Amino acid sequence: IYGASTNADRDSSGAIVEEGSIGAFNMRVGDCFNDIGASDEVSSVPGVPCSDPHDNETYAVFDVSVTSYPEGEGMSELAFESCMQRFESYVGKDYESSSLDITTMYPSVQSWAQDDREVVCAVYDMNAEKLTGTAKGSAL
């Protein structure tokens, strides 16, 4: 079948060793992936080995602990603030002086109704340069 996406292959430690699709609910800390273009809802991302040039790296995955979906931009703000709190311990440099920025994936109103509570935090280069290697402990 042409054009069919395959899942990213992982080694025994869980690191991606061959590029392929990673489901939005299967993201792991340390996963590197490329951009998919502008989209409100993400079901999967193109995962790549971190040794290959890539756009983003997942540095935190967690469930939000609020009991109801925040109004307006509340979920976006909650996800970003929560990701900021986890940034320095992964990258090794505080957010304000880093050359990396944060992107988040978080529940939509629709996925919240299906018990989705997961937030994914990822870093990318502010100048839209490709990253090579892991951002973990890089102090970029």
Residue ranges of predicted features:
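Primary mode marks residue(s) on the alpha4-beta5-alpha5 output face of response regulator receiver
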Residues: 1-140
